Every structure is written in C-alpha cells, then in structure tokens.
Amino acid sequence: MNSRTTPSLCIAALAVLLAATVPVAGQDGRAGGAAPGAAQGGRGRGAAPEPAGPIPRRPDGHPDLTGTFSGGLQLSHTVILEAHPGGFGVTAGKGLIIDPPDGVIPYQPWALAERDRRRDDSNGYEDPVGHCEFYDIGRVHSFGQTYQFDGDDYFIIHGNQHQTRVVDMKRKTHLPEGIRLWLGDPIGHWEGDTMVVDSTNFNGRPRMAIGGDFYGPDAHIVERWTMKDSNTLNWTMTIENPKVFTRAWTMTSALPMTRAQNARENYDDEDTCHEGNVDLAHLKNLYYQVHPEKAPKAQ
C-alpha cells in the first residue's frame, strides 16, 4: 500500500478484520466463496487471455512458467486467512487456509496471544507495510499479480509491491543461519510438473495479513507452483515452525492465478511508496475513530 490507498479502503479493511474475529459455522467454499475461475486481476490491464491450451514447456521438458498471472482481488487488502463472516464486498467463507480442515491457524498458546495483540486496533499501524517495508511471502502471492521469469539456473518471482525473489534452482543448501532476510532464502527444484520453492532464514518482521498473523524467523516455508493449463497457475504455501505453531498448515491463493495479457507494462512501473505515503496516517486515524479519547488534543 502507498499513496493510492484510500481512507474508505482502510475503513473497509478494518471492519472486515474486526468481523473476522467472530466465529463462523456451517460455511462451505474457499477464498471468500468466490466462484472458480472468477479471478480479477490485481492491477490487471490489457486484453482477455487467449483460450487455454496445453501447458507450455521448456526445452528440458519442465513447464514454462514465464509470464504474468493475476490472482483474485476480492481479498487483496485484507488477505483473510481464517474463516470469516464477510462484509464490505467480501463473501463469507473459509478464507485461504485449506489445511487444517477447520481453516484455523494452529498457533501455540503464546503465539495466539501475540497474534491477538497485533490484531488489536491499537497496534494496527505497527504493520511494516505501512512503513513501506516488505509484505511476507503469502501476502505477496495470494493476491494481485505475480510476474515470473523462468530460467535454467534461476527463477525470478516478482510479486505485489515490486517485491522480487530470485530462486536458485541449482543450490541445495540454505544460507548460513546468521543471514536473515525479509522474504527468506529461496531455493527451488522440480517435482514432476510442479516447481517447489523451499525458504528459510527469515528475519521474522513481516506480517502475514493486516490482522497480525505471523510465522516467526525460524519458519520453514514450502511453496508449490503448478500449471493447470497454459493460462492457469495454482499456488500453495505450507508453513511449519514448531516454536509458533502446533502443526504445519497450508494456504492457497484466493483464486487460481490466470494469465494476464499485455501486462508486462506493470513490471516496468515504478511503484513508489515513501513518496506521498499516507498509510500510517490512515491507520492512526482509524485507531482514533475507535478510541477518540486517545486522539491528540487540539492545541
């Protein structure tokens, strides 16, 4: 988020966030109940994609994942991971978690308390994104657009907010323990037609959503990128960290990512943030609306 973020969008995000804490029962469907194939591009511009065909392949036989793919926008600024009652244009549903089946992140008791502390509206402006810092991996690729450039030795993933990861397809071991990165250290390999990205060495600072979810610096994250046809890319992410969670859990993109045509121009755009950034002001204003007694007194 940056200067394009509007007050109404922030208010909607906060309202859905607060509503997401209400238990929901008897819900079916994933990713906010959106219909399959109803993907809406993050910034998608350009013509509709050509009809789907066979999976494109590289000379070595692996799928060619090069291109621009758009996920669903419905959950883009809330990234609702768990079951939620809906509101503000977001349909009630199970969120993005597909395992465990109940759609609830399996936090350790202390970690759940920390998540709730971060979720409290008084801590809303602690979100690093409001400071023009990085999203986490899931927040980058579960919505919006993903630009991918396939190669023999390296695979470049360019996600939302111009956050780029270079996946080393040859290296077998991760960086030394002391090197900690915002998006971790990604190394990749192929399992049949699925590209697997294995990441460790996180610095623990990004949040998974505006709701304060986190996975900690010692997380081990495995992503799977699988093409269904020439226009459709499925993505899942499995997270494990025994210090934070009671078991591993898996989320997926809001909708299957579909190929966007003529969208390379988005990669070339300069995505400014510090210049004219208004996120912190919006987040603080939301807090003061909820707690007017804590608002600064007029001089």
For every predicted segment, state its role.
Residues 14, 20-299:
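PEST-like low-complexity, intrinsically disordered acidic/proline/serine-rich tracts
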Residues 1-12:
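Bacterial N-terminal signal peptides that target proteins for export
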